[in-house]
Curated annotation (Swiss-Prot):
One of its GO terms (molecular function) is structural constituent of ribosome. InterPro entries: Ribosomal_uL11 (IPR000911), Ribosomal_uL11_bac-typ (IPR006519), Ribosomal_uL11_C (IPR020783), Ribosomal_uL11_C_sf (IPR036769), Ribosomal_uL11_CS (IPR020785), Ribosomal_uL11_N (IPR020784), Ribosomal_uL11_N_sf (IPR036796). This is Large ribosomal subunit protein uL11. Pfam families: Ribosomal_L11, Ribosomal_L11_N. SMART domains: RL11 (SM00649). NCBIfam families: L11_bact. PANTHER family: 60S RIBOSOMAL PROTEIN L12, LARGE RIBOSOMAL SUBUNIT PROTEIN UL11M. It comes from the Bacteria. Gene3D superfamilies: Ribosomal protein L11, C-terminal domain (1.10.10.250), Ribosomal protein L11/L12, N-terminal domain (3.30.1550.10). Belongs to the universal ribosomal protein uL11 family.
Length: 141
């Protein structure tokens, strides 16, 4: 018989740095999940992505066991890393903070493809370009 799903918890945690401190501890503790076990498994699974923020969906079952799925980092985090900037522009229409080539956008779109609803790579690239534009990053050919 399948386990009964109690809840799903969505968090964004820095790769390899999950600790029982907030936001992880309280979110998992209120559902009776073994926090240290989650932190250990998450840190092992995301050690190679150090420095990135990793979205995670934790499914908690009625017997207090859990499973989790890690997703690709948010597009904004990948764009900031590629452009070498700390944050996007406060006025993206007037003040541009960086310039990226289209091939960099293509690489980010390929990486994000499993988590995007886009049917083609070109559609995924347009999605990433829209995110870049809203952050004040110029995309060149």
């Amino acid at each position: 018989m399948a386990k009964k799903v109690l809840t799903q918890i969505k968090l964004q945690i820095p790769a390899g740095k999950a600790t029982p401190a907030p936001p992880v501890g309280p979110a998992l503790g209120q559902h009776g999940v073994n926090i240290m076990q989650f932190c250990k498994e998450f840190n092992e699974r995301t050690a190679k992505d150090a420095g990135l923020i990793i979205p995670v969906v934790i499914t908690v079952y009625s017997d207090r066991s859990f499973t989790f799925i890690t997703k690709t980092p948010p597009a904004s985090v990948l764009l900031k890393k590629a452009a070498g900037i700390e944050s996007g522009s406060p006025k993206p229409n007037k003040q541009k903070v960086a310039t990226l080539k289209r091939d960099v956008i293509r690489k980010i779109a390929e990486q994000k493809m499993p988590d995007l609803t886009a049917a083609t790579l070109e559609a995924a690239m347009r999605t990433i370009e829209g995110t870049a534009k809203s952050m004040g990053i110029v995309v060149e050919d």
